[in-house]
């Protein structure tokens, strides 16, 4: 009788602990597991875009002939430098290796704009900023809505309002640049 009660207690104990051990194993693999590829790709793409924004912002602050374009460039340099620093920490925490230099696609955009000057630079730079920020808003919104990693999703959500503000500012600056060209 004693042996049966002990065996029964052991079986009940195992039955109670088994679901908890599966839950613990699942949660530890979520924390320590590999970041989903889509989230890692988002981080890498955001880092490249952010570095490009900083580089182009420096060029605009230096080369722009229009004061609004100059100011926009300075703002891009400041805001994207801050976001890049946050993203570097997030990437490090998630085990994502970021390149310290621009890839060919982003470097090509920088090189093309760096060759321009005056009103041509102003126009092409601000056009590029409108296009880039439209694209950024879509990508960040997608990550904020559908990202698999909670920390990456949170960072995208936190950064999104600033990108939307940049887009509005780029669009209003673009209108001003086009209007000044007509006069």
Q: Which functions belong to the PLM regions below?
A:
Residues 2-13, 17-183:
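His/Met- and acidic-residue-enriched segments that coordinate or traffic transition-metal cofactors
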């Amino acid at each position: 009788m004693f042996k049966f009660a002990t065996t029964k207690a052991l079986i009940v104990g195992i039955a109670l602990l088994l679901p908890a051990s599966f839950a613990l194993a699942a949660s530890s693999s979520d924390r320590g597991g590999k970041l989903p590829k889509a989230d890692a790709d988002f981080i890498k793409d955001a880092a490249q875009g952010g570095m490009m924004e900083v580089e182009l912002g420096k060029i605009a602050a230096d080369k722009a002939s229009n004061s609004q374009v100059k100011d926009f460039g300075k703002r891009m340099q400041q805001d994207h430098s801050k976001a890049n620093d946050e993203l570097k920490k997030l990437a490090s925490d998630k085990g994502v290796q970021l390149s310290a230099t621009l890839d060919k696609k982003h470097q090509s955009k920088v090189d093309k704009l760096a060759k321009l000057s005056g009103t041509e630079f102003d126009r092409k730079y601000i056009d590029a900023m409108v296009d880039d920020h439209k694209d950024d808003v879509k990508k960040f919104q997608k990550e904020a809505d559908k990202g698999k990693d909670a920390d990456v999703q949170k960072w995208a959500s936190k950064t999104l309002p600033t990108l939307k503000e940049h887009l509005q500012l780029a669009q209003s600056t673009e209108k001003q640049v086009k209007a000044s060209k007509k006069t």
